[in-house]
C-alpha cells in the first residue's frame, strides 16, 4: 500500500519506495516473470513463520534494515532548510506555551523529515522540544511530553515530527540553530555506525520492533557539529507505530547508558541528543 501499488489499491498514494515494488519489478510481474508466494505478508507474519520453522530468535526477531542502509539515517544537507513564516512561528510558539504549562519551549529545527499525513507522503519541519528546567531522565514526565508531541502536528500542518532534547550538551538552547552542510561519506558513516550500535545495544528488546540513531548537522552555541536522535518504535505491522515510552517499553537506565555512550563516541562531535516522541502517523519510522 505504501508503495502506491495499483494492484493493492486504486487510491493509495506513494509514501515510500520498496525495493520489491519499483517500476522494473511491476513490469516483470505483469509479464509473469515473478512468483511471489508471500507477497502480502507483513513483518509480524514473517517472524511468526520464522519461529514456526524453528529459526533462532535472533534471526526471527531481527530488525528491518532499509535498502540504502544507514544512508537514510544521515540527514544530508547543503545548509538550513527554510522555516515557516514568522506569523506561523508566532502562533506555534503561543500554542505550545499554552499546552506546555510553562514547563517546556519548542523550536522549529532548520531540517526537514519525512512523514505520512492524510495518506500522503510529507516532507516537513521537525519540532524540537526542550525543558525549561532540565531534570534527570528518570524524573522526566514522559506522559506530558508525549501528549504535547501528539498535539503539535494535529494543530500545525507544517510539522510532522517532534523530538525531545534529552541532552543539550554545552548549548544555549534559546540561541538560533545553525545547520551546516553534511553529505554521505566514510567519516560520518563511521560516526553513525558507532552511535547506532550504542542505541541498539542498550534500547532494543522484545517489546520494540525497531530502534536506531539518526544523525543531522545541527547545533546552537556549542562548537560540536552534529546532533543525534534516538528512534524506537513499537508496532506489529509497521503500517502504524507508536514511539516507545522510556520507563515503560525500555528502562530509563538503558536510555542513560545510551546517552553516555553517544557522548563518549570517538570523533562523534556530539552537540545535542534527542529522543523522537512521534508516532506513525504523522511521522514515518525512518526520518528520511
What are these regions (language model features)?
Residues 1-288:
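ATP/NTP-dependent adenylation/nucleotidyl-transfer catalytic domains that generate, transfer
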Amino acid at each position: 500500500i505504501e508503495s502506491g501499488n495499483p494492484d493493492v489499491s486504486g487510491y493509495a498514494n506513494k509514501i515510500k519506495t520498496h525495493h520489491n515494488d519499483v517500476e522494473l519489478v511491476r513490469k516483470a510481474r505483469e509479464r509473469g516473470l515473478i512468483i511471489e508466494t508471500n507477497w502480502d505478508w507483513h513483518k509480524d507474519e514473517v517472524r511468526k513463520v520464522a519461529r514456526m520453522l524453528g529459526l533462532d530468535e535472533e534471526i526471527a526477531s531481527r530488525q528491518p534494515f532499509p535498502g540504502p542502509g544507514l544512508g537514510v539515517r544521515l540527514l544530508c544537507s547543503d545548509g538550513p532548510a527554510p522555516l515557516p513564516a514568522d506569523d506561523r512561528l508566532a502562533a506555534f510558539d503561543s500554542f505550545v506555551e499554552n499546552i506546555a504549562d510553562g514547563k517546556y519551549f519548542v523550536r522549529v529545527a532548520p531540517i526537514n523529515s519525512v512523514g505520512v499525513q492524510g495518506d500522503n507522503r510529507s516532507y516537513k519541519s521537525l519540532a524540537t522540544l526542550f525543558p525549561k528546567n532540565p531534570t534527570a531522565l528518570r524524573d522526566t514526565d514522559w506522559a506530558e511530553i508525549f501528549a504535547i508531541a501528539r498535539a503539535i502536528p494535529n494543530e500545525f500542518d507544517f510539522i510532522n515530527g517532534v523530538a525531545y532534547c534529552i541532552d543539550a550538551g554545552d548549548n544555549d538552547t534559546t540561541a538560533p540553530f545553525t545547520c551546516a552542510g553534511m553529505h554521505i561519506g566514510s567519516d560520518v558513516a563511521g560516526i553513525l555506525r558507532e552511535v547506532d550500535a550504542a542505541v541498539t545495544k542498550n534500547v532494543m528488546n522484545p517489546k520494540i520492533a525497531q530502534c536506531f540513531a539518526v544523525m543531522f548537522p545541527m547545533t546552537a552555541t556549542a562548537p560540536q557539529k552534529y546532533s543525534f536522535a534516538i528512534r524506537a518504535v513499537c508496532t506489529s505491522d509497521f503500517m502504524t507505530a507508536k514511539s516507545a515510552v522510556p520507563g515503560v517499553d525500555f528502562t530509563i537506565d538503558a536510555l542513560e547508558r545510551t546517552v553516555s555512550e553517544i557522548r563518549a563516541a570517538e570523533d562523534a562531535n556530539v552537540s545535542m541528543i534527542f529522543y523522537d516522541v512521534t508516532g506513525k502517523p504523522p511521522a514515518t519510522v525512518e526520518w528520511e
